[in-house]
Amino acid sequence: MEEIEVKFLDIDPEKIQEKLKSTGANKIGEYFYRRQVFDYPGFTLDKKAAWVRLRDEGDKIILSFKQRLGTTSHDGTTSDIGMKEVEVIVSDFNKTAELLLNIGMIYKFYEENKRIRWKKEDIEFDIDFWPKLNPFLEIEAPSWEKIDEAVKILGLNPADKKIFSTFQIYKMNGINELDYSRITFDEMIKREQ
């Protein structure tokens, strides 16, 4: 299934929330996410712009396969055309991680982020905070037309929308996630070579 979402970088979270409130959007909540990202030895999924993500959202745990579509660069200089995403809800973060390791996958890295979620009808607006990155806005909707509508409602410049992963945002900021085994708000631990 294609994930339909765009990102706007280097946003002012307070101004975006004021705009969202003025449009009648509802604040859903503030979240702390922890995720473990997996690959096969030699990062074979990464070479296909894909990964397996296990994410604890507090109220649910989601296992996802994600793959960037229409990839032309890995450094954020160009947008992708979309994202393939297949998700299942699982009941136990640690047991699921153990299962993935037992079928031959390896830890790619562990990371954390914080998110403020707003919703207007069927459009989700996520203000994301990641270690060492400026806040950014992610808009997800059921269609590209709805994305365009959301961009217009917020008065954002459509030319500023990006279709790419957080991995690419880190690359744009001179950080290669593959160099790290752990990326949190408290520490960034380099991968052992």
Regions found by a protein language model. Give the residues of each.
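N-terminal strand-loop-strand beta-hairpin
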Residues: 1-125, 156-193
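Surface loops and adjacent helix of pleckstrin homology
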Residues: 66, 130, 142
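A contiguous pocket-lining binding segment that forms or flanks enzyme active sites
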Residues: 128-134
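A hydrophobic, small-residue-rich beta->alpha segment in the mid-to-C-terminal subdomain
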Residues: 144, 150-159
